[in-house]
């Protein structure tokens, strides 16, 4: 029945919103390209989109950062117990210790180590999305750690299950309640030969300067279901530019349709590819960076880390401390020009109207 309702909703949505023509022979692997055609993660921006300049303030603390989603799409792997740990984001406590009951068991290779020695930063967001043995159910939890091979993993919060064939909106990005797999840059994307990125992205920005809060909106908008717990005392407290009420947690941020991307004079090829994705699909605001930087969400899985592949392909990391590099300057070119799609709603995903590019192809049988 649930699958029928998803299909019915998709037909109704497409009847009300035009779409560009797709390649009728193309298919996709749900493990690499999940969720329905009309999921927020797959829906292109429409010609009916209404753009409001976000006026994101230029970052000062670093040139660019990433936020890694832990993605495990290995449903045939042996089951690993994931037990309770209550360290959370307290830097004085360890996420490695088992401190309570087993939350659930999931197919994750024991050889995959996610620990203070391997992760970035002191207390990363650490959202895990793992495909269960039924090859359909995605479980999500946060903050995940697996510090020792042969031992249980740990985490604290468990989110509602998602269907890999469904809309996949929600999950383990705690600042917004949005997915820890949808929107992530996946291994095999953004290479010299992979072609355009064909899904929405996810970004984090600095809440104190860029995420609006008031008592009415509580600092978030659809599809986010919340903002950070500290939002009322934190968001917009260091804002210098004009107020942009539309730029709240969950906002769909995009380069406007009228913008000629070549006019931005990108210095690096991967930035130009990213810019096209920001224009055709946009990026959902899913977390606060909590320091004065931009972040794009990327995959870390047992198969590898996106940034390692990026370095092999392009000769430099997505992460840079310096603002005075070609990549950092390109990130300013993108983020400082982002606009909120202000009419992005459940019935007009991407703003509605004919889509800028074709919808995702059907799933491979």
Predicted regions mapped to residue ranges:
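Sec-dependent signal peptide cleavage junction
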Residues: 18-19
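C-terminal motif of bacterial Sec signal peptides marking the signal peptidase cleavage site
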Residues: 14-15
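Short, surface-exposed polybasic-aromatic patches that bind anionic ligands, especially phosphate groups
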Residues: 23-365
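Short, linear, compositionally biased motifs with a strong N-terminal bias
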Residues: 10-11
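Sec-dependent signal peptide recognition
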Residues: 2-7
């Amino acid at each position: 029945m649930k699958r029928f309702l998803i299909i019915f909703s998709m037909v109704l949505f497409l009847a009300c919103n035009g779409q560009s023509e797709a390649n009728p022979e193309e298919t996709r692997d749900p493990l690499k390209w999940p969720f329905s055609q009309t999921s927020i993660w797959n829906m292109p921006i429409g010609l009916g989109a209404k753009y409001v300049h976000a006026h994101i303030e230029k970052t000062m603390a670093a040139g660019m950062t990433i936020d890694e989603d832990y993605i495990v799409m290995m449903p045939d792997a042996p089951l690993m117990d994931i037990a309770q740990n209550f360290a959370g984001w307290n830097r004085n406590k360890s996420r490695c210790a088992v401190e309570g009951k087993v939350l659930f068991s999931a197919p994750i290779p024991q050889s995959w180590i996610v620990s203070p020695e391997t992760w970035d930063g002191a207390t990363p967001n650490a959202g895990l999305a793992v495909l269960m043995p039924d090859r359909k159910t995605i479980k999500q939890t946060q903050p995940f750690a697996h510090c020792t091979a042969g031992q249980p993993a740990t985490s604290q919060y468990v989110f509602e299950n998602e269907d890999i064939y469904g809309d996949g909106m929600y999950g383990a990005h705690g600042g917004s309640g949005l997915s820890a797999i949808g929107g992530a840059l996946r291994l095999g994307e953004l290479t010299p030969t992979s072609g355009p990125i064909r899904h929405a992205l996810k970004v984090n920005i600095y809440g104190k300067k860029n995420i609006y809060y008031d008592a009415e909106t509580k600092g978030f908008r659809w599809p986010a279901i919340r903002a950070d717990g500290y939002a009322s005392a934190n968001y917009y407290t260091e804002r210098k530019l004009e107020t942009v009420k539309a730029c709240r947690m969950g906002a769909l941020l995009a380069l406007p349709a009228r913008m000629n991307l070549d006019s931005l004079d990108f210095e690096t090829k991967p930035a130009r590819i990213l810019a096209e994705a920001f224009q055709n699909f946009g990026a959902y605001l899913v977390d606060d960076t909590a320091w004065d930087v931009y972040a794009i969400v990327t995959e870390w899985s047992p198969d590898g880390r996106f940034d390692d592949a990026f370095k092999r392909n392009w000769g430099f990391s997505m992460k840079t401390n310096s603002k005075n590099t070609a990549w950092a300057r390109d990130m300013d070119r993108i983020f400082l020009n982002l606009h909120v799609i202000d009419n992005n709603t459940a019935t007009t995903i991407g703003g509605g109207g004919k889509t800028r590019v074709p919808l995702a192809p059907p799933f491979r049988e």
